[in-house]
Amino acid sequence: DVERSRGLGDVYKRQGSDCAVIGLFGDDPNDYMAKCGAKWLHKNGVNVLCMSPGKKNYSHVNFPLERIETAIQWLKNNGNQKIGIMGMSTAGMDALVAASLFSDITLTFALTPSDFVWQGFEQGEKDGCKEWPIPGASTLSWKGEPLAYMPFIYEHPVYWQKIQEETKGSGDIERSTCLFIDSENAREHTEEEMIPVENIKGRLFLVGAEDDSFWETGKYIRRMDERLKE
């Protein structure tokens, strides 16, 4: 049980397999989405280690990439010869950054990802808001330092108010694109905040849609494709 022994996540073992995929499926390594992801990966013959930023918490505030580095080493120490990673949405961004950093990852699935690192955010309850950006924080960190990131144009509490406005009061953040589109339109990206996908080893699968209701993942994937061609 990895969760008890190392605090990394939940392992779903596939009998006889010496390959593993790190699954980044949401806010809990043992919820329905994680189990569905693990089941699909099992059908494809691999062990699965599901991880999340926190237990029942999808906040991304300087999430230490060392956790994924430790998970890779744990998997290698426990008989896995090949290691992949799969993530969705913000966790798809996490998967790309990790794969660009750790050469032991030789299979990467990024589902509806961004091609750059975002400012850190928290979820919960604060001043009537269910999500808010964290000033000066990135979504990810490495060696104790936040990664360079694209800041949100909106601060708390306007950040959540914009979500409410766009979703007609439902607060369904997965149906709100203004945070991301407006923030990108506010300034040019720096090279430091872009994900160096050209450093990813092995196979890379990028999956998205033009009509994504959350952010412009189709555009992000095209930019990554151009970066790889260059």
Model-derived regions: residue spans:
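Conserved alpha/beta-hydrolase "acid-adjacent" motif
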Residues: S213-R223
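Short amphipathic alpha-helix adjacent to the substrate-entry channel of hydrolases
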Residues: M33-C50
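Accessory cap/linker subdomain of secreted extracellular hydrolases
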Residues: F109-N199
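Short glycine-enriched nucleophile-adjacent loop
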Residues: G92-S103
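Alpha/beta-hydrolase active-site loop
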Residues: S59-N78, V97
